[in-house]
Amino acid sequence: MCTAVRLTDKNNNLYVGRNLDWGVPFGEKPLLVPADWTWQSRHIGAIATQSPIIGMGLLMKDMPLYFDAVNEAGLYCAGLSFAAGFAHYNDADPSKINVTSFEMPLWVCSEFTTVAQVKEAAQNLNITNDAFDPSLPTSDLHWFVADKDQSIVIEQTAEGLKIYDDGFDVLTNQPDFQFHCNNMRNYIHLDGDWTPERTMRNAHLTALGVGPSVMGLPGDPSAISRFVRVALLNA
């Protein structure tokens, strides 16, 4: 179960992160790489980081495999589970920018400083089906990319690469992001404001307490319900 969220305060300071709920530990730990550190992308070749990057992930063969990461410019990228047949990676395409799924957070944070830059580059992006090695198969993921101004979602599907502006500043897991957006229309009546009293014809009512304005908010841990819950709390 993974949920990512972006928010800013009144001074436009960025707060962004995700939870990472595994049934068993994988040896994940904080990983820091410095500026001007060069790594070898599977298809692009040598890439030098523009600024320091910190995040959570695995260190395999001296390669940081980030679950999520942020660079010094405040650009953040997280890979969240997108399983059950929703993710669809491709063979490398010589006409595209080919990035493996395990490289995505590192690639984003190495090459760019804003979401707008990522969005422009992703128009020609192809996420490939390469595994890191035989002992570490490909993970089915979609990606939440955020900075102080906005967030986007990137999904590689059977229909092609999808890039969505994320007005909710939230991402969970499958189904696809468009499903979550449409599903939010079922909860348009929910409101975080408290209505202490109301008159209905000749009857005057006072609230029994705080909370009735969000009656019907789903409380289960499914990805669909988590998206609704965090989107409302982040509204």
How would you name each of these model-derived features?
Residues 25-26, 80, 86-88, 153-156, ...:
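Short helix/loop capping segments that flank catalytic or ligand/cofactor-binding pockets
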Residues 23-43, 162-190:
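A short, surface-exposed interaction/processing loop segment used at functional sites
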Residues 115, 119-155:
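Aromatic- and glycine-enriched pocket-lining scaffold segments that form the walls
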Residues 1-15, 51, 130-131, 138-139, ...:
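C-terminus-biased signal that marks the final domain/tail of proteins
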